[in-house]
């Protein structure tokens, strides 16, 4: 009896440790972008996206399986402290989509803070920049398996040079990571080689 109870306790301890480890991985916080403050080139959201941008991306589930691939053409327009990004998407399965971001820059306690809205965004997106890195967080309604599901995006945009930036976005639901997006933005000379982008057929 005593030995059986002892084994039961050991089993419960092992299960608890396993669950804590799994939860820690799923809920692990993303890095504070302040650690990138000295990285160059310094990212300027408005300057980088001004004009036309092309981008290529993939979506992977949390197991690393490729689920979707897509390309995007982005037209940007500046008006004062407001930046409008008109994004047009084409997915490999032929689906087309469009999202228009309206992003405003404000200075709060000496720090630039970005807020953005789009039709399919719940509430307001918020963003900050440190060095070559921008964090951009928002909740969005996506259609998954024929159902509309609200998920959270934690985006990190890293400017590599004047013509290129890489976006890593972590997608979560109820705090659990369900997938990630990798997106490469191309500007100026690199973008010119791809324009006009075919957004009608893959």
Identify the function of each model-found stretch:
Residues 1-4, 106-108:
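Long, acidic, intrinsically disordered low-complexity segments
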Residues 45-51, 129, 160:
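Edge/loop elements at the starts and ends of beta-strands within beta-rich repeat scaffolds
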Residues 2-50, 56-65, 190-202:
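Amphipathic/hydrophobic helical signal segments and adjacent flexible N-terminal regions
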Residues 49, 70-72, 151-153:
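Hydrophobic core residues within well-ordered beta-strands of beta-rich domains
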